[in-house]
Amino acid sequence: MQKSVRYNEGHALYLAMLARKEGTKRGFLSKKAAEASRWHEKWFALYQNVLFYFEGEQSGRPAGMYLLEGCSCERTPAPPRTNAGPAGARDALDKQYYFTVLFGHDGQKPLELRCEEEQAGKEWMEAIHQASYADILIEREVLMQKYIHLVQIVETEKIATNQLRHQLEDQDTEIERLKSEIVALNKTKERMRPYHVHQEEEDPDIKKIKKVQSFMRGWLCRRKWKTIVQDYICSPHAESMRKRNQIVFTMVEAETEYVHQLYILVNGFLRPLRMAASSKKPPINHDDVSSIFLNSETIMFLHEIFHQGLKARLANWPTLVLADLFDILLPMLNIYQEFVRNHQYSLQVLANCKQNRDFDKLLKQYEANPACEGRMLETFLTYPMFQIPRYIITLHELLAHTPHEHVERKSLEFAKSKLEELSRVMHDEVSDTENIRKNLAIERMIVEGCDILLDTSQTFIRQGSLIQVPSVERGKLSKVRLGSLSLKKEGERQCFLFTKHFLICTRSSGGKLHLLKTGGVLSLIQCTLIEEPDGSDDDPKGSGHMFGHLDFKIVVEPPDAASFTVVLLAPSRQEKAAWMSDISQCVDNIRCNGLMTIVFEENSKVTVPHMIKSDARLHKDDTDICFSKTLNSCKVPQIRYASVERLLERLTDLRFLSIDFLNTFLHTYRIFTTATVVLAKLSDIYKRPFTSIPVRSLELFFATSQNNREHLVDGKSPRLCRKFSSPPPLAVSRTSSPVRARKLSLTSSLNSRIGALDLTNSSSSSSPTTTTHSPAASPPPHTAVLESAPADKAGDSADMSPCRSPTTPRHLRYRQPGGQVADSAHCSVSPASAFAIATAAAGHGSPPGFNNERTCDKEFIIRRTATNRVLNVLRHWVSKHAQDFELNNELKMNVLNLLEEVLRDPDLLPQERKATANILRALSQDDQDDIHLKLEDIIQMTDCPKAECFETLSAMELAEQITLLDHIVFRSIPYEEFLGQGWMKLDKNERTPYIMKTSQHFNEMSNLVASQIMNYADISSRANAIEKWVAVADICRCLHNYNGVLEITSALNRSAIYRLKKTWAKVSKQTKALMDKLQKTVSSEGRFKNLRETLKNCNPPAVPYLGMYLTDLAFIEEGTPNFTEEGLVNFSKMRMISHIIREIRQFQQTAYRIDQQPKVIQYLLDKALVIDEDSLYELSLKIEPRLPA
């Protein structure tokens, strides 16, 4: 018996599984049975050259398999059908597709298959045809033959190439041989030439003619070439390329400095603090280090790569291609974006960490490193915020000197657009963190430190020099005179005003600040401001006459110590008015917050009044306003972008008035609106307060607390026309009680039958213990105390913030002088009414007709508050920005008409009338002080017949008069000229005449110095003149006239003088060392970092270099637009501009006390002594000609 064929069944099953998953062709087919002519439907799967079939698609084991190697497949016609069965079934069978698989040898029965669709049948036949290993071998053999043929061709080409290379090398060798032969032949000819010359003597005239011809040809070629070069040098293209190259060189220098700053930040602060955080007793943890220095190290690595790329480009000069470098920088901007978003949080974390004394001590050690050059950590953290705007300015300048068809132009424009997007975010963050950095800088200047400045909610308002008048017992002023030199020297104080505190410091010779041991830090919540101190009994004329009405008094009533008084003198009436306005507004904000918290019952931990929190318009972004995360002095989010309407609405919001918003608005309103529009808004608020205030604001103004709802007296308003108004609120005094209950000391001239409430004007009181009243009020005023009566007396001993209510008051009691207590039920005053009266009429007596009904009248409250707001804004506007009214007579007349309309109100309170009269007096007075003296006035006063000469004038006289002239020119610049970059426009002389005069004066003084040096013919006289002018510059430095220092040093650095090596060799070493010191002080390196530090450490008066501030303003203007794409005002930018203008005006407002010397001034202003630049250089070449090359 023949045995059956054995095969590997397990492997066959594995192949069947692969066929089911990865088969070439799979699907149902009908297979004809071998026994009977019956068709059975099976599921077939073709894998390589093996055909499996299964009982169904889900069957795991195959029913059989066919080996297709060496077989063929062809289509067969449908078999004949019997007539049995329905006709439809026969038609269906005829339409099916039949094909047969034939095996290679005889005797093997073919495999007959069929499928329902013709397309599927063709695909099966094609797949079976290709399932042959023999066919694949044949195709492989054909490909191998082709490959071998190609390899042979390549080898042949290589051989041919080598042959050609050898031929070329042989030819090169032959060429070198022929060249050497030619050289040898030429040398042979040269040796043989003398014999031919001897034989044929040339005519001497011919020799001369040839020499002249050769000379003429050379001269003509050189002249032609010089003309070509000169024409190109003077061409616009060459000028543009020079400027472009200069921009690139400046950019490389700035990038080098920036990388060095980042290196100091990382290696001088970040890495040492990481090590300190890993110590046993860490002064700071790793999380805080990461929060402060987020991405700083990565930014340093990025810019080191960028800097190396710039230096590599310079190596290929004059070909400068920069666009690809910016293409490298742009993808890394997301690193900068993270740094920008973290910037404000970084400075807040740093301020909190500085409260740890160990960390503060360690940080001071790091900052004492000579590499830091006296700069603080927050300064280094801010440098990356200014770098992207600097790139934008550079790209602007590059594009201005790049032709439109230049290959780099599109790339540079794309880089600029991408950087501008990030720059807008950076400017917003820099604006938001300006206040934190300013506070930290002042805190670091104070030797003893000042913890209150580490509070990030403190907002810097103003600083300046004031004179503190010494006082004796009983609050009487010492008998001192304003002109006393000892008073100025010993009593000069550097004062800083913040939203919550007032700092009084003395400055040491090194520039550092020292807080006064007594009264150095004044909490404004404990202060009462007295604008016009009354004279004592011994001095009937009063201190106002003694000090020229420049003094004001701050009465401090600390809760745990005896009260004391600080008397300060301002340098001018305008300065006094500005200080008074800002201090009273800061006190006002604090008192308003405190009163609102008492009136509107809140949780003791909540400092923001409920009615402000519930107004979404004050903190929620909308289509016409966008807020930042930073809060202003009234605990309301600062405005980032807003429409003009929303800014005017914030200015006239009767619930609060932020002093920092008001100062920014008054500094920059000219950019986005006009003075006429602002005044019209104030006039509308006064005349039509109900139609000018948004409805939602009115609703929230009268909103009452949930737990203390009192009903207003039912009745109509007595009249709809304006009858009542109030002047700007001033400070109220706070007293402490033995039982530590919260009290507000208030004085009022109310009718004795009514227990109403009012606040006394502190400007009308002479001391904190005495109370005065308006002259119109004949009866003595009644003292009232508004007392919070808690249900639980145990809560009285809790430690409370000055601005918070200690507990929920159940009712208000009015304490009359006789000791009787009247319950508040006698006058049903709503919390909103009580607050409005207390704040709107702060410090003023009540009118005779003030009664219970008017107290509860909403219209009455709104009118009083609206009048208060109008007078408050006008007081700030007139006292701080008098130039607005001096230069715009129409605006001045409109304000006068509005104030006269207020004065015509028959029911105006005496104190309101006094406040209005003060504003009118400030507008109408003609101040003849020399603070308004102009350069033209001095020129007219110095018409002397004979001017002094340089030799007869001392260095001190020259320095003093230069300082006087520089400060007069500097302070004459109106602040509106700093807006809009007018000094860079084509019509700059019309838009910014005073800035252009300042620039012209700077150039004329510098030209005078250079001209006077060049006027001397002998070397010794020129050297002596240089030494004298350096001495003048050093005296200017002592006088804080850094503009004068730069005038002289720039003159000495002119090429006409700098090139005089023989003259400089005669100058002493001490003078040269002093010259280097002065140049370092006023150097432009690092955005004038040395000059900024010097100005920060000196007291006014001073004359800074104006170009430094103009650069800052141009930097801000170029970095971000004034308006967004939606047409909103970029108020963050306005805030940054306001900070710079505030610093400029700080130096403008403090005048020098230097007497004019007409002869010296006439010498300094004599234009006949000035030599122009070209003549100076020609004179310099005559004095010391160029050395032959």
Swiss-Prot record:
Phosphorylated by CDK5; down-regulates RASGRF2-mediated RAC1 activation. Ubiquitinated upon interaction with Ras. Ubiquitination leads to degradation through the 26S proteasome. Residues 205-234 form the IQ domain. Changing residue 1022 to E: Loss of interaction with Ras. Loss of Ras activation. Loss of ubiquitination. Homooligomer and heterooligomer with RASGRF1. Interacts with Ras and RAC1. Interacts in a calcium-dependent manner with calmodulin. Interacts with EPB49 and probably CDK5R1. Interacts with the AMPA receptor through GRIA1. Interacts with microtubules. It is a peripheral membrane protein. One of its GO terms (molecular function) is calmodulin binding. The modification Phosphoserine is found at residues 725-726, 736, 745, 749, 801, 805, 924. Residues 743-751 are annotated as: Regulates proteasomal degradation. The keyword Repressor does not apply. One of its GO terms (cellular component) is endoplasmic reticulum membrane. Residues 243-429 form the DH domain. Disruption phenotype: Mice do not display overt phenotype. Preferentially activates HRAS in vivo compared to R-RAS based on their different types of prenylation. This is Ras-specific guanine nucleotide-releasing factor 2. Keywords: Calcium, Calmodulin-binding, Cell membrane, Coiled coil, Cytoplasm, Endoplasmic reticulum, Guanine-nucleotide releasing factor, Membrane, Phosphoprotein, Repeat, Ubl conjugation. It is found in: Cytoplasm; Cell membrane; Endoplasmic reticulum membrane. Residues 1051-1080 are annotated as: Responsible of the affinity for farnesylated versus geranylgeranylated Ras. Residues 762-776 have a biased composition (Low complexity). It comes from the Eukaryota. One of its GO terms (biological process) is long-term synaptic potentiation.
